[in-house]
Amino acid sequence: GLETKFYEDFQKNDLEDVLKIDKIKIINFWASWCLPCEVEHPILMGLSKKSDFIIIGVNYKDTEEGSAEFLNEKGNPYDLVVIDDEGMMGIEMGLTGVPETFVVNEEGKIIYRIVGPINNENKF
């Protein structure tokens, strides 16, 4: 996959750059303090082996230590990690809580949204 990049301070134009990537994007909002995020994590790890989309992890209202520890322990499925400690990107995307996942097409339009943990019924 791509190198995982960490955007430390989320800027609106970072999101615009990401949305312009000419691939299907799975944008997954998660946090180390979120128990259902742990439940869905193995599914994300499985998805990360496919190459027809990129997976963007938005670490939501979390600490850097917490998020790093979570990914070190459980594996990192993300091509790109955005640190959204203020919740700005969540506001931009109309987040209702974590975990929440948006599927965004090549043109940058949200085509699918999963509120709550991803499960094996979700088709990617």
Predicted feature residues:
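A short beta-strand-turn-helix
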Residues: G1-K25
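Extracytoplasmic/secreted envelope proteins and their assembly/folding machinery
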Residues: E16, H41, M45, E64-L71, ...
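Short pre-active-site segment immediately N-terminal to redox-active cysteine/selenocysteine motifs
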Residues: K23-K25, W30-W33, G97
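Hydrophobic beta-strand anchors of alpha/beta hydrolase catalytic cores
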Residues: I26-I27, I55, T101
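Conserved redox-active cysteine motifs that mediate thiol-disulfide chemistry
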Residues: F29-G46
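Solvent-exposed loop/turn segments at secondary-structure junctions
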Residues: A31-L35, K61-E65, G87-M89, P117-I118
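Conserved segment of the thioredoxin-like fold in thiol-based oxidoreductases
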Residues: K49-E86, V98
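Thiol/disulfide oxidoreductase modules built on the thioredoxin-like
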Residues: N72-P77, D84-F124
